[in-house]
């Protein structure tokens, strides 16, 4: 080793080094610069240095300044040592953190390894159990074959001598297949070992309970829990019964509406929603489980999952309505339903009054029937008859049609002094369309000018042949005023009902027809229902048209509350959620949910139908409709009536009012009092509000006064239709009529400055007026039509010139006049038109 001990010798040349650098500038100029480079010596402590010098913060640890590296101050040295300590501390923390992470990773690896070993052990046990089961089955099969073979040999071979009896212990221990006197074979020894192992396994499986002695002695080790024992027993039981195999997929019938949510489709198939979404994505549809798909796509998905699709429609909700045919043994006799029809003022209601021995006509406005009345009459013979009284006015066509649809017998009332009239013919058509028998009642037979034979003859023109004319239609001459022939009429009705043999099942769910509907102020929506099948009871839940409800009360034709109504019984039904349409069918259902669902479906179907009817199919049709509407003036009205039938009759009557130039537009019609909503609607459309047998409430009257909306009240449909006709006639353009008043012959044409050409004329016929219109005729051809600018007589402006006098005329904005032309003078008159 040298004296320097591997260190470099110190020298004096280690301070700084100098040199020159040449700088270049533009235009080829250069400059030499003297550069001095200084080097700093950094002292690093040796690795074996004591740590005490770095842990104290006193100035003594900085050492002797003479031994410190050059250029390092105390503060710099302190900062460097602090940084060194922080670095060592971080290194210790990092090492600790890495050790913790390594330990956690090792624990995770150990846990996974244990799980894998447990899984492998479980797989081995399962495989061992399966192998053991297979061996047991194979061994049992071989033993059965061996036993069968020995039995077959024993049958063929002669009976051997009885062997010497062996000791009891040997017989008990030897297996059945072992032959006496021979040592056990290898297979038998293996079989015995398997049996012992199975027995031990079964004992350990059933040793789940831990006794006190075992716990205190500490023998037996840790046993499995009771839950684990039960799970193992359940697995063994399922394996023995063959449940270990994968269950077969259950094929389901999936109800498929027109549109369905993906989640709902998955629920109906009992599949995971994610699988259904995945299947749809494979089909190119990026949907979520909350989106709807159409029925065709859903059917493809259902078939892909192996199920069967059953298409259903929204209309299937009505299948809950009972439409089963009644059995013959359940049918019982029911009263006949008789509808009285005929022309207005022929005495239908008066005839019914005479039968009921009451007065109904006095209660009808104007003495005419404006509602369908339903009554039950009990005759002297004890028979019960149900009568329907229909209006005879032309506006009530739909009411008569409804009466004919629900009736069994039609009584056609014809006045003997008036014969067959238009509504009589209409009633005959309704009766024939309904295919119901008809009885002709020739009324007003007590009048002096009554001619029943004329009635019978007129009926022949409409293919109604009465018995007295060798036909099959019954006819009776009656007088509602004197009561003549009423008994015979009732006998004929009873005879006809007996022939029809009318029967119905009162035990089924009720079904009936709405004869009339109204909105009562105190009772709400009220429907007059004629029960056709079954029995309607209080508390029944029903659906009628687009409305539904629960029977709150039943009121018969005498105003009495009843608990139930059987077939052919007319009642007023309270408890509806809205006013139904007259003619709707009432059906009783099981639950409110069914009734609400059916009503909602019907309302949606009606709304879609109206939208489809109002929508134009092409742009050309839309433009043509808009052009046609622009040429037609409209009279908007809002109709409110006391009952649904009257409202419909008014609307139908007003639809017939008008022509190609004007029409009545019904903005809204309904049942009940006039409300503020009706006033608001009328004010927005500048319409009038018409109330038929109803009045406006206080708020509606106040709103009408503020908004200047006209409200008109009527109780007779004649007056209502006539007033609307007058109002609609005011929208017609006035008819312009021309009246010829004279001719003038042009003799000479003069040119006057400031006026133009002036014709010197002589009035040849009639009179010439300054305010009249004129036509210029040349060779009997009209070449100009206009007005006069001036009419003078001897330089004086005059209003008219009589025949035979001369005058001067100048035309307004026209000067092509010649001698010999003829001027035709006429006046126009506007005449107000009226609707027919």
From Swiss-Prot:
Region span, G1: 342-349
Record's compositionally biased regions (Low complexity): 50-60, 167-176
Span list, region G3: 389-392
Subcellular location field: Cytoplasm
Compositional bias of kind Polar residues: 18-27
Biased composition (Basic and acidic residues): 88-156, 185-206
Binding-site residues, GTP: 342-349, 389-393, 443-446
Highest taxon listed in the record's lineage: Bacteria
Alphabetical keyword list: Cytoplasm, GTP-binding, Initiation factor, Nucleotide-binding, Protein biosynthesis
Pfam annotation, one family: IF2_assoc
Stretches the record annotates as G4: 443-446
SUPFAM superfamilies: Initiation factor IF2/eIF5b, domain 3, P-loop containing nucleoside triphosphate hydrolases, Translation proteins
UniProt-annotated stretches for the region G2: 367-371
Region span, Disordered: 1-233
CDD domains membership: IF2_eIF5B, IF2_mtIF2_II, mtIF2_IVc
GO CC term (a single one): cytosol
GO molecular function list: GTP binding; GTPase activity; translation initiation factor activity
Chain residue ranges for the region called G5: 479-481
Domain called tr-type G: residue spans: 333-501
Transmembrane segments: none
Main location: cytoplasm
Annotated family: Belongs to the TRAFAC class translation factor GTPase superfamily. Classic translation factor GTPase family. IF-2 subfamily.
Record's function text: One of the essential components for the initiation of protein synthesis. Protects formylmethionyl-tRNA from spontaneous hydrolysis and promotes its binding to the 30S ribosomal subunits. Also involved in the hydrolysis of GTP during the formation of the 70S ribosomal complex.
Designated name of the protein: Translation initiation factor IF-2
The organism of origin for this protein: Cereibacter sphaeroides (strain ATCC 17023 / DSM 158 / JCM 6121 / CCUG 31486 / LMG 2827 / NBRC 12203 / NCIMB 8253 / ATH 2.4.1.)
């Amino acid at each position: 080793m040298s004296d320097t001990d591997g260190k470099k010798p110190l020298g004096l040349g280690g301070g700084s080094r100098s040199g020159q650098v040449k700088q270049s500038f533009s235009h080829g100029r250069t400059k030499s610069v003297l550069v001095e480079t200084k080097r700093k010596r950094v002292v690093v402590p040796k690795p074996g240095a004591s740590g005490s010098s770095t842990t104290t913060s006193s100035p003594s640890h900085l050492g002797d300044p003479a031994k410190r590296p050059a250029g390092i101050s105390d503060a710099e040295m302190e900062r460097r040592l602090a940084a060194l300590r922080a670095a060592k501390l971080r290194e210790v923390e990092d090492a600790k953190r890495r050790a913790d992470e390594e330990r956690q990773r090792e624990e995770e690896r150990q846990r996974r390894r244990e799980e894998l070993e447990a899984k492998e052990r479980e797989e081995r046990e399962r495989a061992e159990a399966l192998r053991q089961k297979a061996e047991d089955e194979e061994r049992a099969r071989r033993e059965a074959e061996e036993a069968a073979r020995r039995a077959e040999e024993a049958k063929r071979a002669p009976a051997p001598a009885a062997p010497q009896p062996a000791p009891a212990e040997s017989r008990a221990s030897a297996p059945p297949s072992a032959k006496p006197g021979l040592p056990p074979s290898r297979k038998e020894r293996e079989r015995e070992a398997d049996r012992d192992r199975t027995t031990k396994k079964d004992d350990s499986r059933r040793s789940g309970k831990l006794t006190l002695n075992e716990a205190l002695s500490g023998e037996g080790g840790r046993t499995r829990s009771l839950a684990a024992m039960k799970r193992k027993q359940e697995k063994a039981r399922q394996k023995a019964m063959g449940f270990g195999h994968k269950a077969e997929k259950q094929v389901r019938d999936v109800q498929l509406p027109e549109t369905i949510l993906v989640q709902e489709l998955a629920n109906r198939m009992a599949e995971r929603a994610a699988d259904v979404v995945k299947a749809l994505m494979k089909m190119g549809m990026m949907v979520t489980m909350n989106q709807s798909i159409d029925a065709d796509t859903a059917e493809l998905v259902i078939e892909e999952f192996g199920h069967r699709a059953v298409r259903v429609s929204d209309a299937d909700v009505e299948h809950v309505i009972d439409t089963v045919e009644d059995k013959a043994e359940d049918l019982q006799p029911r009263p006949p339903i008789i509808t009285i029809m005929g022309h207005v003022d022929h005495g239908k209601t008066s005839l019914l009054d005479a039968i009921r021995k009451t007065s109904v006509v006095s209660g009808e406005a104007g003495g005419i029937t404006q509602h369908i009345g339903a009554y039950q009459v009990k005759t002297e013979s004890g028979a019960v008859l149900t009568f329907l009284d229909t209006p005879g006015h032309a506006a009530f066509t739909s009411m008569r049609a409804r009466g004919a649809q629900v009736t069994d017998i039609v009584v056609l009332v014809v006045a003997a002094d008036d014969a067959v009239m238009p509504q009589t013919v209409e009633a005959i058509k309704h009766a024939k369309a309904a295919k119901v028998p008809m009885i002709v009642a020739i009324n007003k037979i007590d009048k002096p000018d009554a001619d029943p034979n004329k009635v019978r003859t007129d009926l022949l023109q409409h293919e109604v042949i009465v018995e007295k004319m060798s036909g099959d239609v019954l006819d009776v001459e009656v007088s509602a005023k004197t009561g003549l022939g009423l008994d015979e009429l009732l006998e004929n009705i009873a005879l006809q009902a007996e022939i029809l043999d009318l029967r119905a099942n009162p035990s089924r769910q009720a079904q009936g027809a709405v004869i009339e509907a109204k909105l009562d102020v105190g009772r709400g929506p009220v429907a007059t229902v004629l029960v056709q099948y079954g029995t309607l009871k209080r508390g029944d839940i029903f659906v009628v048209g687009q409305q539904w409800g629960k029977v709150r009360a039943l009121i018969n034709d005498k105003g009495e509350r009843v608990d139930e109504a059987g077939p052919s019984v007319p009642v007023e039904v309270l408890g509806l959620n809205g006013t139904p349409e007259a003619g709707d069918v009432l059906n009783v259902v099981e639950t409110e949910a069914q009734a609400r669902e059916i009503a909602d479906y019907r309302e949606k179907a009606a709304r879609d139908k109206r939208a489809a009817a109002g929508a134009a199919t092409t742009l050309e049709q839309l433009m043509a409709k808009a052009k046609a509407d622009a040429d037609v003036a409209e009279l908007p009205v809002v109709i409110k009536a006391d009952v649904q039938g009257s409202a419909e009759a008014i609307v139908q009557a007003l639809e017939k009012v008008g022509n190609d130039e004007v029409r009545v537009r019904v903005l809204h019609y309904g049942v009940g009092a006039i409300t503020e909503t009706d006033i608001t609607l009328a004010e927005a459309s500048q319409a009038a509000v018409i109330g038929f047998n109803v009045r406006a409430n206080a708020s509606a009257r106040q709103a009408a006064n503020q908004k200047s909306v006209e409200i008109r009240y009527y109780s007779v449909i004649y007056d209502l239709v006539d007033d609307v006709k007058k109002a609609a006639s005011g929208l017609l353009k006035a008819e312009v009529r021309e009246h010829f008043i004279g001719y003038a012959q042009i003799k000479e044409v003069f040119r006057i400055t400031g006026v133009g050409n002036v014709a010197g004329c002589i009035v040849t016929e009639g009179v010439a007026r300054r305010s009249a219109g004129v036509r210029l005729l040349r060779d009997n051809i009209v070449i100009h039509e206009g007005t006069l600018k001036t009419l003078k007589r001897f330089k004086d402006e005059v209003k008219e010139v009589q025949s035979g006098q001369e005058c001067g005329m100048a035309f307004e904005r026209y000067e092509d006049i010649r001698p010999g032309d003829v001027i035709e003078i006429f006046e126009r008159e506007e005449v107000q038109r009226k609707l027919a």
